[in-house]
Design a protein with these regions (language model features):
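Transmembrane-helix motifs of polytopic, lipid-linked glycan transferases
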Residues: 67-87
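Specific aromatic-rich, kink-prone transmembrane helix
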Residues: 119-137
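Transmembrane-helix signature of polytopic, membrane-embedded enzymes
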Residues: 80-103, 121
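Short acidic/glycine- and proline-prone juxtamembrane loop motifs at membrane-interface regions
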Residues: 109-117
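Short periplasmic/luminal acceptor-recognition loop of GT-C membrane glycosyltransferases, typified by
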Residues: 305-390
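Signature aromatic-anchored transmembrane alpha helix within multi-pass, membrane-resident enzymes
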Residues: 277-309
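Extracytoplasmic catalytic/substrate-binding loops of multi-pass membrane glycan-assembly enzymes
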Residues: 15-50, 60-63
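Hydrophobic/aromatic-rich transmembrane helices and adjacent perimembrane loops
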Residues: 252-285
Length: 398
């Protein structure tokens, strides 16, 4: 039996390894997408503030652009590790739980992209950590959450439900007021005809957790309610899950609004699984072992696809079918244009121009570029991954 110190050391080693891979991915592989460029240059939001501060401090590059979100991932994992300090009887089980949490497909993706999901995840985990340590709610942070993102409406509703269990009138009034305010400020729609997006929602949840893990998540939510061992985390995750299911009957939901509140249930889910596993003799653990192998297979497959996905282009007949196509090639195009001293360009593709602007390629009529071939172009620039053409840029000097 290894000591707690050993597993703590192993935890920080694994976290450091994941952070290294995330930094490598952000710096060497990903390019800014059109939506990310919109947030950086044109929108005014928390994402704009975070990315602008980071690029001001560390330079206008991909690593600086995504650095805040990798940091929020790191903090989310560390605070979750602290929250589950007394969840398990052994340090080994605690490590297994946080290991699964760290490798969640949805969490890793949120750490790599310019989006609010990982920020919401961290703030929610920090709120839970504060509540656990100090045995009181962080009331003063809740109005700030209202300004951060519309998805905190779900947290306010969960806290409203939890206030009845906790018999906390102050929490009841504050959470109800903030829920009503956020509902109207962010103009949530509940109209329209039923269209049935439930299967789509379940499919996205399966991608966030991995398919088998999501099925066990549903069971764990139900099981926790049956044995009446519900806590604040259960209220938050169950509220988000049920709300997303109900909303899916009428409209297509933005899963990033719900995902931060369901992934935090993973340690509780693992606690249920490991308890069921430990109480059985070895000869009766076969089905559980199969479950573990399947879950680990999908998690490591996800890691492979997250960090080594460019070879998938070799399997596709059209490059734009790649699931992260919109996060590729802009940086490479900018580098090729700079090599040719073509730093001022115009194009009918305004999305591409906004992406290139991040790499200091300005919109000015010195050169005309297009992804579509046209008569009498001067030069053709081809971006290749693993010797396969990904995108062609046709250039004409004006």
């Amino acid at each position: 039996m290894y000591s707690k110190v050993f597993y703590n050391t192993l935890f920080y080693f694994v976290l450091a390894s994941i952070l290294y891979m995330l930094f490598l991915q952000t710096n060497e592989v990903l390019s800014i997408s059109y939506k990310e460029a919109l947030n950086y240059f044109e929108n005014i939001s928390l994402l704009t503030i975070l990315t602008r501060i980071s690029t001001t401090l560390f330079g206008q590059n991909d690593l600086a652009l995504r650095l805040p979100f990798v940091v929020f991932y790191c903090l989310s994992v560390i605070f979750m590790y602290k929250i589950i300090d007394d969840y398990f009887k052994t340090a080994k089980d605690r490590f297994i739980s946080i290991f699964i949490f760290m490798l969640l497909p949805g969490l890793l993706s949120a750490a790599l992209l310019v989006n609010s999901a990982i920020v919401v995840t961290f703030l929610t985990i920090f709120y839970i950590y504060y509540y656990k340590v100090y045995k009181k709610h962080l009331y003063y942070a809740l109005p700030f959450f209202l300004l951060v993102d519309n998805s905190f409406t779900i947290l306010f509703l969960a806290l409203f439900f939890y206030s009845f269990k906790d018999k906390d009138k102050k929490l009841l009034y504050i959470s109800l007021a903030l829920f009503v305010i956020s509902f109207f400020v962010y103009e949530f729609r509940v109209d329209g005809r039923p269209q049935g997006f439930l299967l789509d929602t379940f499919g996205i949840y399966a991608a966030i957790f991995s398919p088998i893990l999501f099925l066990y998540f549903l069971y764990a939510i139900y099981r926790t309610a049956v044995i009446k061992n519900i806590d604040l985390i259960w209220y938050i995750s169950a509220t988000a899950l049920l709300l997303s299911i109900v909303a899916s009957f009428r409209q297509k939901i933005y899963i990033e609004d719900f995902a931060p509140f369901v992934v935090i249930f993973v340690p509780t889910m693992m606690k249920i699984f490991l308890h069921s596993y430990r109480v059985r003799l070895k000869e009766f653990r076969k089905n559980y072992n199969i479950f573990v192998y399947i879950v680990l297979f999908f998690l490591f497959l996800n890691i492979l696809l997250t960090f080594v996905n460019k070879p998938i282009y070799l399997l596709l007949d059209r490059a734009n079918k790649h699931f992260v196509y919109e996060y590729h090639f802009a940086k490479e195009i900018a580098e090729e244009l700079k090599k040719r001293e073509m730093t001022n360009v115009v194009s009918p593709d305004k999305h591409l121009l906004l992406r290139l602007r991040f790499y200091k390629i300005e919109e000015y009529p010195d050169y005309f570029i297009s992804q579509e071939a046209f008569y009498n172009y001067d030069e053709k620039i081809t971006i290749k991954y693993y010797n396969k053409d990904i995108v062609n840029i046709y250039v004409k000097k004006l």
